Amino acid sequence: MKHFTKEEVIRCYRERKQDRCKDCRLTQAVTKLPNGLDENMEALVTEVMDPAREKLGMPIFCNSGFRCPSHNAACPGASKSSQHMKAEAMDVHCADNKRLAKIIVENGKFDQLIIYPTFIHVSWKRLGGNRKQILRKTATGYRAISAVEI
């Protein structure tokens, strides 16, 4: 993990630091995830995010990484089987989200890439097949797009 700290990726995120999730043990700075999920998070960063950051040449900020089930349920629109709960997903943003999305797709190591108006959701499965699914969030849901449409 070259460009992201564990605390940055594994905190159970709230808008303000003092509002971190009170339903899980991640209310303080931590260096280890529950249930041995460290390997998933490290694989996501090492295989997907660090190479993207290297090629992009500018900072990438993590909006949300790991989420405990209670926090995930409180996130509007979050899937009940969200990869955030498995430490397999991050929501990120940078100064050029479109370029970042293209870099991740070109690298070829991702499970799902969802383009939202202000951030990108990216996931990677350390174990099992990765779908290489590219979606765009629309007013009515999600639309599958090709790499050319990014």
Feature roles, as predicted:
Residues 26-29, 55-60, 86-91:
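Generic detector of short, locally flexible boundary/turn motifs and exposed helical patches
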Residues 8, 70, 75, 79, ...:
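Solvent-exposed, flexible loop/coil residues
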Residues 1-53, 126, 141-150:
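Extracytoplasmic cell-surface/polysaccharide-interacting catalytic and binding patches
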Residues 46-77:
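Extended, low-complexity, intrinsically disordered C-terminal regulatory tails
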Residues 80-81, 85-86, 90, 94-150:
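Catalytic cores and adjacent binding grooves of peptidoglycan-active enzymes
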Residues 12, 21-24, 62, 68, ...:
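Generic recognition of cysteine residues
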Residues 40-42, 69-73, 92, 100-102:
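A short linear-motif detector with a strong N-terminal bias
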